[in-house]
């Protein structure tokens, strides 16, 4: 394998970095102060300030492009930062602490508490404080990198023009060389069920409930469903998830991991009805909700009554009223914007990234696309391997994976070998009294190359990044097994699983 310095020199000789740095020296990055009736001139205009949009805007400015970012909401950061990834992680973390203190976990560690009370208002306040700090951080980064922020609903009104409609009805026109659509996604509605964000809620409403419901039904046991269901189950709700598929964890999860994950969640008190569909929901006079369900392929009907119904059946691209139809840009059958490998639409100077294009709807996938898309505008290469994009479920224990699952390898006819290591045999997990789960490695039988990594256990969301690095650079299971890992750490389980995959046996199990 080439050293990084040799790779860097090789790329430099090919002119990739020089084209980006020298080709843009004459481009100004100074923001313009304008009046509403005076157009802004820009090199790149990004519509949307979520993880893909704001990162793309900053990178574009760093490359020397005069950059504008248009955002319809009052705060920057998109769904992820305001009503998604970030606030949900705050609640997941704090609800886990409460669960440990309220249950027998603390007592088993010699920590005795006479009374544990939940102050939900304070918990929500901590969540909001974290969100506010991070949204303010993006605003600071925009100023630091000289990105012009326009608050308004962005619509493409020409091949080289974006018009932002502001809350007061005024408009701001931006004349621009390139347009990048990064408008993200929105909650997919459930046919026949109206979300009021009070008792029938989407993920947005579930992040701001005023009290812990006695009973909650979650439609969908994918990533968002199990995460938010876990929050309220830990805080005291009786939670049942109804899932059309026969497993929990959503698309891409390894089935062995999914089964073990479901078992652990059930042990915690989370209930599941798999291979089951919701046929309707009715609000009663007492405020409770009757949820009608039956088998996915038909069968006996049943009614579950709850205080809060959480709808988590996925998300859909947000592409409405962007002006795409007028430009002749047609959406695919799933409502996504078709793009080429450089993220260009059928109009070469109009690009799209993130949830509005094909691929997993993940914040970090959008970030990567945003960076390489604007590098491509500057003449650079646009490399991305979607097989190396990790997925994480932030419950406790966490679930994380990257690469292929066993089911995918079987379907593709690829011969593989498996290495496993349980956290019960890991010394750090033992000292933490947190031993549920395992690491599972899939390697190519003929070459030993890592094909997939699947982790169920403490710290899985951090550990999976080591696996992503291995996949990105084509590492073998032996490569990882021969890297010295600090002791005692949870990541030793990752090394041991690779030992098992490469040599047929781990050391400590």
Curated annotation (Swiss-Prot):
Active site: 487
Example GO BP: 2-oxoglutarate metabolic process
Transit peptide location on this chain: 1-35
Ranges in a coiled coil: none
Co-factor: note: Binds 1 FAD per subunit.
Pfam family for this entry, one: Pyr_redox_2
Disulfide partners: 80-85
Residues binding FAD: 71-80, 89, 154, 183-185, 355, 361-364
EC number: 1.8.1.4
Residues bearing the modification N6-acetyllysine: 66, 104, 122, 132, 143, 346, 410, 417, 420, 505
Sorted UniProt keywords: Acetylation, Cell projection, Cilium, Cytoplasmic vesicle, Disulfide bond, FAD, Flagellum, Flavoprotein, Mitochondrion, NAD, Nucleus, Oxidoreductase, Phosphoprotein, Redox-active center, Transit peptide
PROSITE patterns: PYRIDINE_REDOX_1
Cofactor names: FAD
Reported modifications of this chain: Tyrosine phosphorylated.
Site (Important for interaction with PDHX and activity of pyruvate dehydrogenase complex): 448, 473
Modified residues (Phosphoserine): 285, 297, 502
Catalytic activities: N(6)-[(R)-dihydrolipoyl]-L-lysyl-[protein] + NAD(+) = N(6)-[(R)-lipoyl]-L-lysyl-[protein] + NADH + H(+)
GO cellular component term of the entry, any: oxoglutarate dehydrogenase complex
Keyword Nucleus: yes
Compartments where located: Mitochondrion matrix; Nucleus; Cell projection, Cilium, Flagellum; Cytoplasmic vesicle, Secretory vesicle, Acrosome
Binding positions (NAD(+)): 220-227, 243, 278, 314
Role this protein plays: Lipoamide dehydrogenase is a component of the glycine cleavage system as well as an E3 component of three alpha-ketoacid dehydrogenase complexes (pyruvate-, alpha-ketoglutarate-, and branched-chain amino acid-dehydrogenase complex). The 2-oxoglutarate dehydrogenase complex is mainly active in the mitochondrion. A fraction of the 2-oxoglutarate dehydrogenase complex also localizes in the nucleus and is required for lysine succinylation of histones: associates with KAT2A on chromatin and provides succinyl-CoA to histone succinyltransferase KAT2A.
Subunit structure: Homodimer. Part of the multimeric pyruvate dehydrogenase complex that contains multiple copies of pyruvate dehydrogenase (subunits PDHA (PDHA1 or PDHA2) and PDHB, E1), dihydrolipoamide acetyltransferase (DLAT, E2) and lipoamide dehydrogenase (DLD, E3). These subunits are bound to an inner core composed of about 48 DLAT and 12 PDHX molecules (by non covalent bonds). The 2-oxoglutarate dehydrogenase complex is composed of OGDH (2-oxoglutarate dehydrogenase; E1), DLST (dihydrolipoamide succinyltransferase; E2), DLD (dihydrolipoamide dehydrogenase; E3) and the assembly factor KGD4.
Leftover remarks: The active site is a redox-active disulfide bond.
Family note: Belongs to the class-I pyridine nucleotide-disulfide oxidoreductase family.
Protein name: Dihydrolipoyl dehydrogenase, mitochondrial
Gene that this sequence comes from: DLD
């Amino acid at each position: 394998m080439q050293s990084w310095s040799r790779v860097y020199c090789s790329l430099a000789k090919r002119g990739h970095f020089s084209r980006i740095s020298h080709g843009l020296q004459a481009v100004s990055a100074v923001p313009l102060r304008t009046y509403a009736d005076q157009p802004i001139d820009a090199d790149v205009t990004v519509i949307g300030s979520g993880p893909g949009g704001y990162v793309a805007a900053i990178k574009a400015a760093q490359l020397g492009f005069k950059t504008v970012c248009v955002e319809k909401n009052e705060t920057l950061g998109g769904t992820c930062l305001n009503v998604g990834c970030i606030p949900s992680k705050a609640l997941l973390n704090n609800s886990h602490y409460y669960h440990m203190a309220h249950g027998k976990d603390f007592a088993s560690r010699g920590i005795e508490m006479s009374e544990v009370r939940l102050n939900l208002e304070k918990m929500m306040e901590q969540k909001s404080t974290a969100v506010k700090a991070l949204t303010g951080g993006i605003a600071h980064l925009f100023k630091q990198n000289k990105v012009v922020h326009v608050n308004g609903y962005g619509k493409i009104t020409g091949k080289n023009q974006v018009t932002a409609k502001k809350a007061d009805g005024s408009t701001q026109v931006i004349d621009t060389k390139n347009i990048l659509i990064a408008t993200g996604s929105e909650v997919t509605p459930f046919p026949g069920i109206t979300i009021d964000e009070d008792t029938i809620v989407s993920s947005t409403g579930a992040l701001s409930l005023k009290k812990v419901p006695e009973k909650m039904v979650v439609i969908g046991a994918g990533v968002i469903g199990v995460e938010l269901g876990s929050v309220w189950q830990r805080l005291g709700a009786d939670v049942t998830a109804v899932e059309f598929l026969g497993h929990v964890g959503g698309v891409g999860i390894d089935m062995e991991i999914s089964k073990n994950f479901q078992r652990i969640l059930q042990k915690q008190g989370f209930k599941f009805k798999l291979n089951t569909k919701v046929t309707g929901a009715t609000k009663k006079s007492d405020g409770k909700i009757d949820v009608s369900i039956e088998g996915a392929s038909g069968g006996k009907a049943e009614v579950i009554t709850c205080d809060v119904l959480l709808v988590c059946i996925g998300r859909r691209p947000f592409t409405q009223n962007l002006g795409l139809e007028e430009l002749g840009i047609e959406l695919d059958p799933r409502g996504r914007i078709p793009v080429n490998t450089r993220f260009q639409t059928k109009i070469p100077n109009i690009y799209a990234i993130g949830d509005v294009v094909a691929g997993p709807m993940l914040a970090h996938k959008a970030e990567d696309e945003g960076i390489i898309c604007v590098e491509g505008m500057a003449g650079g290469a646009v490399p991305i391997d979607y097989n190396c994009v990790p997925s994480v479920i932030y419950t406790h224990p966490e679930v994380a994976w990257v690469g292929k699952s066993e089911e995918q390898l079987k379907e593709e006819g690829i011969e593989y070998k498996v290495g496993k290591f349980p956290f019960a045999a890991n010394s750090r997990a033992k000292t933490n009294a947190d031993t549920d789960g395992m690491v599972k490695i899939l390697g190519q039988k003929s070459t030993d190359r890592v094909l997939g990594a699947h982790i169920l256990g403490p710290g899985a969301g951090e550990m999976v990044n080591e696996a992503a690095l291995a996949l990105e650079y084509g590492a073998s299971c032996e490569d990882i097994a021969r890297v010295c890992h600090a002791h005692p750490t949870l990541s030793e389980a990752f090394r041991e699983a690779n030992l098992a995959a490469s040599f047929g046996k781990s050391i400590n199990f």
